[in-house]
Amino acid sequence: MSKSLKKKSHWTSKVHESVIGRNPEGQLGFELKGGAENGQFPYLGEVKPGKVAYESGSKLVSEELLLEVNETPVAGLTIRDVLAVIKHCKDPLRLKCVKQGGIVDKDLRHYLNLRFQKGSVDHELQQIIRDNLYLRTVPCTTRPHKEGEVPGVDYIFITVEDFMELEKSGALLESGTYEDNYYGTPKPPAEPAPLLLNVTDQILPGATPSAEGKRKRNKSVTNMEKASIEPPEEEEEERPVVNGNGVVITPESSEHEDKSAGASGETPSQPYPAPVYSQPEELKDQMDDTKSTKPEENEDSDPLPDNWEMAYTEKGEVYFIDHNTKTTSWLDPRLAKKAKPAEECKENELPYGWEKIDDPIYGTYYVDHINRRTQFENPVLEAKRKLQQHNMPHTELGTKPLQAPGFREKPLFTRDASQLKGTFLSTTLKKSNMGFGFTIIGGDEPDEFLQVKSVIPDGPAAQDGKMETGDVIVYINEVCVLGHTHADVVKLFQSVPIGQSVNLVLCRGYPLPFDPEDPANSMVPPLAIMERPPPVMVNGRHNYETYLEYISRTSQSVPDITDRPPHSLHSMPADGQLDGTYPPPVHDDNVSVASSGATQAELMTLTIVKGAKGFGFTIADSPTGQRVKQILDIQGCPGLCEGDLIVEINQQNVQNLSHTEVVDILKDCPVGSETSLIIHRGGFFSPWKTPKPMVDRWENQGSPQTSLSAPAVPQSLPFPPALHRSSFPDSTEAFDPRKPDPYELYEKSRAIYESRQQVPPRTSFRMDSSGPDYKELDVHLRRMESGFGFRILGGDEPGQPILIGAVIAMGSADRDGRLHPGDELVYVDGIPVAGKTHRYVIDLMHHAARNGQVNLTVRRKVLCGGEPCPENGRSPGSVSTHHSSPRSDYATYANSNHAAPSNNASPPEGFASHSLQTSDVIIHRKENEGFGFVIISSLNRPESGATITVPHKIGRIIDGSPADRCAKLKVGDRILAVNGQSIINMPHADIVKLIKDAGLSVTLRIIPQEELNNPTSAPSSEKQSPMAQQHSPLAQQHSPLAQPSPATPNSPVAQPAPPQPLQLQGHENSYRSEVKARQDVKPDIRQPPFTDYRQPPLDYRQPPGGDYSQPSPLDYRQHSPDTRQYPLSDYRQPQDFDYFTVDMEKGAKGFGFSIRGGREYKMDLYVLRLAEDGPAIRNGRMRVGDQIIEINGESTRDMTHARAIELIKSGGRRVRLLLKRGTGQVPEYGMVPSSLSMCMKSDKHGSPYFYLLGHPKDTTNPTPGALPLPPPQACRK
């Protein structure tokens, strides 16, 4: 906010704070008097000597005005409400008081009728008082009643005589005229009326009276002309403030700012932040340097539109609040009616929505507030140049009425492709260095099409010649994107590597929602009129009139929707998350939808990274919980929509929490870390409850049933095409596996389930001696709020098995305990799924999610001796977090050997029968060195289409280390035991500790790599580090990052391998990526998020090219952030432990990040901190804990800290970093990276992580406004 520069001492300099607690009697030791019901500020009465428990601050003095209680402004509240605030505050209480005198005394009416400069502390305090008054009072007016207004709620309608009587009696705190009618603000009653009691009794500290349903300040009352009193001499000596644009804000404009919302013309009286009662002089001087949207000289001569309000930022910049849409904008809406096309503007004026910035560093540039972009070229000159250069055919733009850019009526939206009206066409585009050569618009709302905004000349789309402006994007590589968000589709396109192609299905016939020829709306030059080759013919047709006609003639670019339910159009890529949610748009795993359907209420899991200014969205209270009120940063909140109900935050249910408690939880989330949200969208939501009949059935059953009665199928024929089996052995129901109707079959399977509830549970299985033994289990799961709690793999091609992927910790499947990763899914609610596609299974789970339960039949290989598998599918000591593991390609289901686990060091039973040789390797080390090898532990994910085998293997051998010298250990060797103790089911951390305690020698029982007959599981170079592999041709061949991933499970990172049967699988052409350490992350706590939609708009007015935070969401001409991309089906952000490139431009005070580590400190280099509002945090990709792999193209392996600083400095104003996604936790000095647990002490690679050596070496790359982080060695030059 802008504050006046004062020559004399202002009353705010006398404000003091007292911190007190309740005394042993539970009392505060002072009386409270005054209150709005008496027309007074609340003030201190008798202060009882010796009864006040002071903790700090000054003493309380009788008769002083009470301004705040624990930062909650109380001026304008009744005594009852002030006491309620104090009652709900926990000790200690922080009271801000001021001595009466000058303009502030106990008389509210006197203070409210003073006239102050807009943006001053006094003006803000007046607004706070009015906000608080309207909690308890209703304005009165002499004007006639309007339609839709409720007497006694919107206004008290009285006669002129009654109004004059109230005025004479002193019952009005404010009064005046507006449009020849009298308006007044009566004193609130001491006890609230029943109408207002329920709403305002919930005022708690921190929950300012901004909840929906509170009293609102009326436009007429706010804008009424009052006989305002000039403030006394103390305030007359304040100098008017120049608002950064040369426009002096005069006191006469102070009262014309609040507008209304609702039938009666009212505005939600969101309270202003508590005034800052003291201000350093250096901050006061900053006001003259601010930049803002320049209001017209006569801006106050025209009223703002209804429900709009003018406000000021802390720097004095003008912005506008639209209470209709609950959004903020830098644009003055009054100027919209005066808008004209850019080409008609004079050279010394700018089009509507544009602003000129003169920056001392970057020079002059222009801000387009409509499209939120910046450019160096004058938009008027640009428009005139384009008009002449392109010979635009629609020159009649200048004859259009003067209005805001011509937005057209939004077409009727549909998620059903068959309902689209227009002609369909398909095209295939190959990604080039400039992207796909077109820009898109739309998708900012759930019911908005994504359309081609422009085609870039000479780009792939222009060269193809088929795409045109306005085309609706329907399918991208068989993924229907109708209803997808803009950010999702952008990420999908960005995930395609350069040189790869995508198939697009477009629908032509929908106009853009704006005039594409209007330069004010253009992100790129308008599409040039050019000769195009005739479109490619598909099956002899150029286009098709209807979508059904189109898909009936071609099946190459879109899936067949004729044999699936309509909702299957919303299918996602393979690998399903069967928890009833859509996949998180920015989460790291490629998962398919298994929600309740696009047209039904649905639960979604989103992952949002908190920035320096919060999460970028606001929340509001509602009868069903906290809902998303406004999206302030669309790019920062991908997948989130206004109106979404927040169900969980980081696995904590928040439905029954108050607004304040949810805000506090969001505040506690650290900056730069991922926060997981489960939100509910659509429908009327209440926590899921099982219907009574279902509860009765569950209770009658006693315990969950396990049916293991079906004959096992030999592995040589794992998926017989004619395999048929009913849901229960006694059932005679049959289903056609060729083309089942999921709806009909679901009803049948439900009837089967209900018919068997009287049958006692049975557990039996039969074995077929002709092949490996299997057993089938029936698993009944009830859907929790987070879903069924497991994921699905496979089914990418017909005939591939459908497998259970990761079992989510604390989910429904995990609590049930019977479902294991690697189980083959045979039936879903009695419907056979063997050989079916992934999408088909996901569709079945949609129906199950809607009904709250599912019956699954899974097939599991039987262990030797017929011993059952462990129930939990994980080792006991595993740590469970929700970071994601690296990508894993689906491995072909192949023949596998199997053996039972062993509890001792002897070879597991069954190894000899398969000619697998184990050997003992003894490694000796010296005192000053480590053993020199790295252990990699797999997670609880299926491998080769079955279970995880020996989960621990050698991932790296250090040159010259004891492990290297013994010449008996190779990369890829599986470790069975350490010093005679089996580690198959041991958590990774325990293995490290076991080796640590081994002393100077350790004995490893291993299965050599060559015995596994699995050459693809490890690189042939046995000493090549995983890190270095990324830069070698071999690594490009075998690296998970370089391979397409048709199916990707989402496994909790820290979860070690489950106690699965010991099986040695052969899996040709399968590429695995393994997690290499624990992920026990606990980042720092930082800044709170936004909770008020009236916050100023996000400042996107950075100089062009000055902030490479993210590629423009509307332009695909950006290079992919890293050439090692994932396949198209995986279009979310890089996953944990992925490699990615960050380019940054240096800010005024540096790059805004600090680093830790270096060779001299025996650790790799990591990102230590991100300075608030610095280039690094604005970039959005770098996070705390990321490992720095390269600096300006130079590898950081064995790099010293000083060399890293030198490289950053040598890059000048730009730096290019290759980073490896970390865990959010920075390793302590003397620790090896948390992503690698090394058993060594070599000089090159550091000491074991369990020793603490040396001192930290943290280097800061500061940014403006950030305190330097020690030591002050900054990357600034």
Curated annotation (Swiss-Prot):
Where is this chain's protein located in or outside the cell? Cytoplasm; Late endosome; Synapse, Synaptosome; Cell membrane
Domain Guanylate kinase-like span(s) in chain numbering? 109-283
Its record classes its membrane topology as:
Peripheral membrane protein
Chain intervals for the UniProt region annotation (Interaction with DDN): 302-381
Electron transport in keyword set: no
Cite the record's tissue specificity text.
Expressed in the foot process layer of podocytes of the kidney glomeruli but not in tubules (at protein level). Expressed in the brain.
Q: Name one GO molecular function term.
A: structural constituent of postsynaptic density
Which residues does the UniProt record annotate as the domain WW?
302-335, 348-381
Q: Name one GO biological process term.
A: positive regulation of synaptic vesicle clustering
Q: Which residues carry this modification: Phosphoserine?
A: S686, S884, S885
Q: Which InterPro entries match?
A: GK/Ca_channel_bsu, Guanylate_kin-like_dom, Guanylate_kinase_CS, P-loop_NTPase, PDZ, PDZ_sf, WW_dom, WW_dom_sf
**Which superkingdom does the taxonomy of this entry point to?**
Eukaryota
Keywords in UniProt for this one?
Cell membrane, Cell projection, Cytoplasm, Cytoskeleton, Endocytosis, Endosome, Membrane, Neurogenesis, Phosphoprotein, Repeat, Synapse, Synaptosome
Q: Where is this region: Disordered?
A: 205-308, 556-575, 869-913, 1011-1130
UniProt feature, compositional bias: Basic and acidic residues: 281-296, 1069-1085
Composition bias (Low complexity) maps to 894-908
Cellular component (GO) terms are: bicellular tight junction; cell-cell junction; centriole; centrosome; ciliary base; cytoplasm; dendrite; extrinsic component of postsynaptic membrane
Q: Where is the PDZ domain?
A: 17-101, 426-510, 605-683, 778-860, 920-1010, 1141-1223
Name positions with the PTM Phosphotyrosine. Answer: Y362, Y827
- Which family is it part of? Belongs to the MAGUK family.
- What does the protein in this record do? Seems to act as scaffold molecule at synaptic junctions by assembling neurotransmitter receptors and cell adhesion proteins. Plays a role in nerve growth factor (NGF)-induced recruitment of RAPGEF2 to late endosomes and neurite outgrowth. May play a role in regulating activin-mediated signaling in neuronal cells. Enhances the ability of PTEN to suppress AKT1 activation. Plays a role in receptor-mediated clathrin-dependent endocytosis which is required for ciliogenesis.
Tell me, how does this one assemble?
Answer: Interacts (via its WW domains) with DRPLA. Interacts with CTNNB1, ACVR2A, SMAD2 and SMAD3. Part of a complex consisting of MAGI2/ARIP1, ACVR2A, ACVR1B and SMAD3. May interact with HTR2A and IGSF9. Interacts with HTR4. Interacts (via guanylate kinase domain) with DLGAP1. Interacts (via PDZ domains) with GRIN2A, GRID2 and NLGN1. Interacts with CTNND2. Interacts with MAGUIN-1. Interacts (via its second PDZ domain) with PTEN (via unphosphorylated C-terminus); this interaction diminishes the degradation rate of PTEN.
Annotated protein name in UniProt? Membrane-associated guanylate kinase, WW and PDZ domain-containing protein 2
Gene this chain is encoded by: Magi2
